[in-house]
Amino acid sequence: MKVAILTQPLHTNYGGTLQAFALQYVIKSLGHEPETINYRKQLPNTSLIRKILSRIKQKIISGRIIYSFDHDEMKIISKYHDEFINKYIKYSDVVYDVGALKSKIISGGFHSIVVGSDQTWRPRYSPRIDSFFLDFLQGDESIKKISYASSFGTDVWEFDQIQTNKFKLLLKQFHFVSVREKSAVKLCMDKFDVQAEHVLDPTLLLEKDIYMNLLSAKPTEHKKNGIFNYVLDKSLEKKDIIKKCAKILQMPVFSSYPLSTHKESCTIEDFNDYIYPPIEEWISSFYYADYVITDSFHGTVFSIIFNKPFISVANEYRGKARFISLLELFGLEDRLVSNSNDINSTLLFSPINFEEVNLRLVELRKNSIHLLQMSLLN
């Protein structure tokens, strides 16, 4: 059976791309034909005057101007991600509006549509949030509607009352609802009166060997040891955390991320500062690391998959609930820190019982795959 997958646009987000890869991998292993729909927001055609006014405002507020990458620049910056997507993920032609999205689903011969995973139910991250509750298929019973590991990204309700009422009606038309966070189970019941199952992020459904096969298919020279720093928000507080950890652990720090993710001049002189390293290199960083510091949900996930000692830095803006829910599954709540005052030698040298973690993962993985399988069959 053909299965459409509706997730957030794939571009340079390591975790986002790998969860899309993993979900397709599992659905394919269950005997279906998955295709991820390349649904994204049409970039506005902003006038020159508006661009200038916006940059003046940025300069006044933040003291610097951030320029947007144009289409050709993005192709260069994301070339390794695009290479991975083209090789491993069946991705449709780009769809910009809800009419084209509906036409793609209806004419594509899909038996089911799966919304997820990642923060598909978070307004600030998803293009036209109504689409991720499948409003364009309202009343259509010919296509099975499923959510797998969808996430609100936070335990704070971000929908207004009109949206809440609308999405409540839409979600009741889903044949199966599952979410990635424990807090989301409660939100679905309290706000939508819908019973949701708590399941694993797709990346945790795959055994480590599958990721190792990706590395074998594209060997990398990136074989650094020490502390893998995968911290997305470069605040002073987080820099202090990294320095303190390096000092206590007596380890060098390495990264696998562009030197710059913001364009602060009209033209780019050296693209090497902006290019996102290959996904295989990012995965290998976990494999070779002796320790991991991250403020990323998927950074935490891959630390667990590769059995690496780690600390996760709480990210209030990106959504702390995601980390709490994930770590509670494995009894690792003590690995979550908020600031440099939480860092000490007792925490950093405290061993993680990965034997127990791995046993829990096997059971959770088995249950999540079973629920996904049943949702596609029933």
List PLM regions with ranges.
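Active-site anion-handling motifs in enzyme catalytic cores
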Residues: M1-N378
